[in-house]
Amino acid sequence: MTSVEVNGRGYRVPVRPIVVVCFDGCDPQYISRGLADGILPTIARLRETGYVGAAQAVVPTFTNPNNASIVTGVPPAVHGISGNYYLDRATGEERMITDAALMRCGTTL
């Protein structure tokens, strides 16, 4: 298999898989302290064998806008995901933002 389709978009299957682990809402100092105290052995192994970095959050500091910024490289004003929920005007209900069609730009993938 050389390609895969996700949410209606085609992607090349990576030659070398990449895994991104996001500690949402976690101050990097918590991780540093846990590593120093030796209570995060799996994170320590990941750090030793891969890449570890901290990212600046976008505003608003909700999960979906930040994850969208990670995969697009642009702020919420560009990609269009400004929260975890939106008000569906047709039904008057709050809906969780999970539909890839709501993205206004491509990804870095």
Describe the predicted segments one by one.
Residues C22:
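Generic enzyme active-site microenvironment
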Residues M1-P17, G25-L109:
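Active-site nucleophile/metal-coordination loop of metallo-enzymes that catalyze phosphate/sulfate
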